[in-house]
Each structure stands twice: as C-alpha cells, then as structure tokens.
C-alpha cells in the first residue's frame, strides 16, 4: 500500500512512525517547537507557550550553536536551510522518540552546513541515547556515524557491516565490497563525493 507523501507511514515493530517532522514556514520558531513538544499529549485551551517552556526552548536552541535562541519569534520560513534542518531535528527529539528516522536529512545542504547539522545530530543522538536509523547516500557519513552500516541495492540488503570491520572501513573498501556483493559498479557521484 502506498501513501501520499504527506501521509506516508512506516511500520516498524507495530509502531506507526510519521515519515516527517515538518515545521510550518508561517509559524514562529517557538510555535513550531511548542507543537512538537505537545505531540502525543492532551491539548487544552491554555496559553500556547508558557514562560518556562519558552526558556527551555531558548536553552535547547542555544545548545545548537546556530543563533536560533535569538530567533524565537522569527518565522521558520526566514531561517537558513541549516537552521531549519537543526530546528526540525530538535522538534523531532523534544519528545524522546523510540526510533529517530533520518532520511537524507543533510542532502539539500551545502557541505559545510551538512557537517554542522551532522555534528548536532551526533550530539543529540548520543546525549539522548536515541536509537537512530539514518538513510544516506553519503558514503563518508555512512562509515563515520553509527554502529552498523547496512547497504541496499535494488531493494535488497547486500552488505551488513559492524564492529571492528566498520571501524576500519574506508570509502574505497566499501565501494569494493559493493561491487563484489552487487556485481555492479557504484554509480552515484553524490555518494562518492559526500
């Protein structure tokens, strides 16, 4: 069964997991965070954002190191791509998820900004001890982050690498393993160039 993009749902161990944690371009940064904070909770007609919540949002935004703590009342649509991606990551983790699914979450960013967002991602995942699945075509990121690397080709798992083997893996090694396992050459410049 296929769902429209905005309604796509993944089922993992009988959990329904929305495919995205989107922000509204027309809401303020703090309003987007408030909606994410209340996800899965009973909603009331109380004021939307309490002072204590606003201070908690400011503290969490300060930790990102992108100056967003001073942009609580800026509309999300006015933020840079990296700021928006970091905001979305924070929104997705305000309520600790059982599984954080990151699908090409740095693909639309320039290399410098992607590196910053990956550093923020790594810090949040480690500090919050989040089980995370990251989908990427970036070979360097696939090797650098996480405990396990699973590679797909034509819808099938062709590699499953972890432990010491993953720690010692290089992009060249990974390409060679891909060629041997799949019987074809890797053809994505984006994956090679990172």
Regions found by a protein language model. Give the residues of each.
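ABC ATPase C-loop
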Residues: 92-93
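Catalytic Walker B motif of ABC-type/P-loop ATPase nucleotide-binding domains
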Residues: 100-103
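Q-loop/switch helix immediately C-terminal to the Walker
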Residues: 27-41
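Conserved catalytic motifs of ABC-family nucleotide-binding domains
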Residues: 96
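H-loop/switch region of ABC-family ATPase nucleotide-binding domains
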Residues: 136-137
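Conserved beta-strand-loop-alpha-helix hinge in the C-terminal portion
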Residues: 156-182
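Helical segment within the ABC ATPase nucleotide-binding domain
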Residues: 114-128
